């Protein structure tokens, strides 16, 4: 759940000392060309949230780079003095926010790197202060909505607007930058007209984040790349199930179910959605929903042909449909995009290792 690297031991490992976590205190450097902060944890995301809400301008690097003897991975935050010329007490604000969030800043004296792309290049892109909305109300899973609201309110500490399904059709989505669609069933609003509205919002530069069962509203619909993966069961097998004795049907249903299992996925760690991660991710799968790889889009996280559950229960028939399927993907539409999240990265707010995917999707 937390994404920690670990080792197993069959014997007791003695500890010789207690390790104390020190207090982070960043010094002001008025000669700094920029302040650099790494990107690989939820604490980094909270730091970014505070920076944006202080109206400070911040960028991120799309590529790995090295500068002044230090290596930084793609996704690293770069706060340039030149971007914040009108900010009063720039150094004090940046260091104070970093100290509050226990983030280590590395001040650098130049924007010219020893490897990678210089800070003035198009690969060092600005992060916008996004205006975010989430769908709520009838058809929305109250649990999924609650997970999202809790995440914004208590962890990311970033503003979020709820749009009820009762008046969704009357809302001008172009007043927002990001629209989150939680788990739910949206046939009442995401009909042909509603999907056209979503599509126009995305083409105009908006980001749509669809989670879990919300993906059904987009799958196999005209104008969208998402496709349901064809099941492995044959018509003959389905007919045999219909003729099965009542007492055997419960076992048969279990054979096609996933009630909570962990699967290891592959990642395209060059895609911004996966910044802060390595080349794999352990996902918690709560049902047997399966979607095909995107033909015209980015398959950022996916299950390869060898994918299987490494913990938890998954029926044998359900397992047949997970390999070579999508986990997280992006479909570009005009100036914006639709992010498909097959599994919920915020499940009950305890699956901490998935939360950075969600933040990457927002910003």
Residue map of PLM features:
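Intrinsic-disorder/low-complexity accessory segments
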Residues: 1-363
């Amino acid at each position: 759940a937390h994404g920690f690297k670990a080792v197993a031991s069959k014997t007791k490992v003695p500890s010789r000392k207690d390790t104390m976590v020190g207090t982070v205190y960043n010094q002001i450097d008025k000669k700094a060309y920029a302040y650099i902060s790494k990107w690989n944890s939820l604490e980094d995301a909270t730091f970014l949230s505070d920076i944006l809400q202080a109206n400070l301008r911040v960028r991120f690097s799309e590529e790995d780079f090295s500068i002044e003897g230090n290596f930084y991975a793609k996704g690293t935050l770069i706060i340039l003095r030149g971007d914040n010329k009108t900010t009063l007490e720039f150094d004090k604000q940046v260091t104070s926010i970093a100290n509050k969030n226990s983030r280590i800043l590395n001040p650098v004296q130049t924007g010219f790197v020893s490897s990678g792309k210089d800070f003035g290049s198009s690969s060092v892109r600005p992060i916008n202060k996004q205006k975010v909305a989430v769908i709520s109300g009838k058809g929305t899973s109250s649990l999924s909505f609650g997970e999202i609201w809790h995440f914004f309110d208590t962890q990311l500490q970033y503003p979020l607007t709820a749009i009820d399904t009762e008046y969704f059709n009357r809302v001008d989505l172009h007043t927002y930058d990001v629209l989150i669609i939680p788990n739910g069933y949206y046939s009442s609003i995401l009909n042909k007209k509603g999907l056209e509205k979503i599509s126009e919002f995305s083409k105009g530069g908006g980001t749509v984040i669809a989670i879990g069962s919300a993906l059904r509203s987009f799958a196999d619909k005209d104008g969208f790349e998402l496709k349901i993966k064809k099941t492995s069961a044959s018509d003959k097998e389905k007919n045999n199930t219909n003729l099965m004795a009542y007492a055997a049907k419960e076992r048969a249903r279990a054979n096609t179910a996933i009630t909570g299992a962990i699967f290891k996925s592959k990642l395209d760690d060059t895609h911004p959605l996966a910044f802060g991660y390595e080349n794999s991710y352990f996902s918690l799968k709560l049902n047997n929903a399966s979607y095909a790889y995107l033909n015209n889009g980015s398959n950022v996280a996916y299950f390869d042909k060898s994918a299987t559950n490494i913990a938890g229960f998954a029926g044998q028939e359900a397992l047949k449909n997970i390999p070579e399927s999508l986990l997280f993907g992006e479909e570009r539409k005009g100036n914006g995009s639709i992010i498909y999240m097959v599994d919920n990265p915020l499940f009950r707010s305890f699956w901490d290792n998935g939360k950075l995917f969600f933040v990457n999707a927002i910003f």
